[in-house]
Amino acid sequence: MAFAIASALTSTLTLSTSRVQNPTQRRPHVASTSSTGGRLMRERLVVVRAGKEVSSVCEPLPPDRPLWFPGSSPPEWLDGSLPGDFGFDPLGLGSDPDTLKWFAQAELIHSRWAMLAVTGIIIPECLERLGFIENFSWYDAGSREYFADSTTLFVAQMVLMGWAEGRRWADLIKPGSVDIEPKYPHKVNPKPDVGYPGGLWFDFMMWGRGSPEPVMVLRTKEIKNGRLAMLAFLGFCFQATYTSQDPIENLMAHLADPGHCNVFSAFTSH
């Protein structure tokens, strides 16, 4: 719910350049060729580790990036700096910088929720087909009996989500104000990046701390999968409303009879 970022490349180049430009810097005595190789390996390891400690800003997409309509010209406010920017804004909704920033964060959080929702629908249905659970149906899950009554669950969810969303809102207004990563006085600390908290809890594999270009690739993959998940969830809602069936059940029926079991048959049968 809570939703990495100076340049690792710059950090690496700075460390390397400082060694070249400061020849008077004291170095440990080298006794043999093998120890020289070991020292160089240790220096390279230090450089790599130093780069991993600073999260990277996304590398903006080039001017010739793919656009939603080939041959079109993107609006000036969509300059390729946002993940998943294909120049699509026909109504000019993102012309205001503050509004564009809000839209980007709103799309990001809705994408993540949609990916969680689609996963939470598909996996239980697969488990039901494998015989691990019985009588699963995601669209009437709210009417089931749980360990507490619906009012208690609703209040608990509102309190927990309110706390997390409040912190996310504070981070949007003042980036880094709710950062939970520890700061070290003798190390280059990552700068805050709204929507990508990183750290042990949200980036334990440190994928968001590479060089800028791979970071942009990963974030673009996330937003593209999130957009697909939002469309998938709308499709699940449509299926549940018109067929009262689950997604995999609808998929199996469509594969068995594509000509008669499709989206058009849902309209003609009602």
Curated annotation (Swiss-Prot):
Query: Where does this protein have compositionally biased stretches of type Polar residues?
Result: 19-36
Q: Where does chlorophyll b 2 bind?
A: R112
* Transit peptide start and end: 1-33
> What are the BP-aspect GO terms?
photosynthesis, light harvesting in photosystem I
Q: Where does chlorophyll b 1 bind?
A: W68
Q: Which residues bind chlorophyll a 6?
A: H254
- Gene Ontology molecular functions: chlorophyll binding; metal ion binding
Name of the protein in question: Photosystem I chlorophyll a/b-binding protein 6, chloroplastic
Q: Which organism is it from?
A: Arabidopsis thaliana
* Gene (name only): LHCA6
